[in-house]
């Protein structure tokens, strides 16, 4: 059994790399992206890149995690170079924003990796600088998706200050897992303070669903047969974000509150 009493044996994770997270694009050129520069010291005192750090943390929390990296053609060799030949890579033929990128990766999981439609999948950006507890929360997110009480499960980051950099998730209540009341665009500081008074969480672009949920969504919005067909016609796909195409229209949505340390390297204002 894949999951025994909602405890998942392993996670299916899609890591969005290669500029699907467009906030990173202005900071670095396409090929030598920020996420491959060895900036971070690990416990052994060795320098590692963002991609290496995230991959190491996931496999530490869940040694059997199945990680697929959705990326551009120009970054595929850098990823193999840093993570080894066995890493699973779904290559986007061209940039089409996050909904097509995630739809392509979901169909890749289904058709190429033989992931079943009732298995949970977690999507996260490759650029958070976090403690290992974050990936324990990601595992919990997979378990919530597996339990199937909502179509979509998001991770919301407990804000440390009224930031203008993030969209906000307003939950129905302050519980660890809550239904989502509404989403808010990036606010000014005064508005952000009002959100914080409503238990609001930062929307960090981390979400989970059963694979079949996204395959169905993709078929309802895109005319295609299977992964190969979508890949071949990818350049004809409409550019649309996952938030806009799926998240904001989903009536059945819940959020898991995460209160650990979290820094999003994609919004760092420092430059190296």
Regions found by a protein language model. Name each.
Residues 15-17, 70, 122-125, 154-158, ...:
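Short beta-strand segments
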Residues 8-15, 25-30, 40-123, 129-135:
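Conserved N-terminal catalytic core of the sugar/cofactor nucleotidyltransferase
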Residues 51, 105, 127, 169, ...:
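Residue-level signal for inorganic ion chemistry
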Residues 20, 128:
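Active-site metal-binding loops of divalent metal-dependent hydrolases
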Residues 131-228, 233-234:
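Conserved core of the sugar-phosphate nucleotidyltransferase
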Residues 11, 209-272:
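Left-handed beta-helix
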Residues 1-4:
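Short, small-residue-biased leader/transition segments that mark boundaries at the very start
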């Amino acid at each position: 059994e894949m999951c025994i009493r909602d405890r998942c044996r392993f996670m299916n994770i899609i890591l969005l790399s290669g500029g699907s997270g467009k906030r990173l694009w202005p900071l670095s050129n396409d090929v030598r992206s920020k996420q491959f520069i060895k900036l971070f010291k690990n416990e052994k005192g060795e320098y590692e890149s963002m991609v290496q750090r995230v991959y190491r943390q996931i496999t530490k929390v869940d040694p059997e995690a199945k990680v697929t990296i959705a990326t551009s053609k120009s970054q595929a060799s850098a990823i193999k170079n840093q993570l080894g030949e066995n890493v699973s890579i779904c290559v986007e033929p061209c940039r089409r924003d996050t909904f097509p990128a995630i739809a392509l990766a979901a169909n890749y999981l289904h058709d190429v990796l033989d992931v079943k439609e009732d298995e949970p999948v977690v999507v996260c950006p490759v650029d958070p600088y976090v403690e290992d507890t974050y990936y324990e929360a990601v595992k919990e997110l997979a378990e919530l998706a597996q339990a199937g009480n909502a179509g979509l499960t998001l991770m919301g980051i407990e804000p440390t200050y009224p930031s203008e950099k993030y969209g906000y998730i307003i939950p129905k209540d302050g519980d660890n897992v809550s239904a989502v009341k509404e989403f808010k665009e990036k606010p000014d500081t005064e508005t952000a303070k009002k959100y914080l008074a409503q238990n609001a969480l930062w929307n960090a672009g981390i979400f989970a669903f059963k694979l079949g949920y996204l395959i169905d969504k993709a078929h309802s919005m895109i005319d295609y047969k299977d992964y190969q067909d979508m890949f071949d016609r990818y350049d004809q796909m409409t550019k649309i974000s996952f938030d806009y195409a799926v998240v904001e229209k989903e009536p059945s949505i819940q959020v898991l509150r995460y209160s650990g340390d979290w820094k999003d390297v994609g919004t760092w204002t420092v430059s190296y």
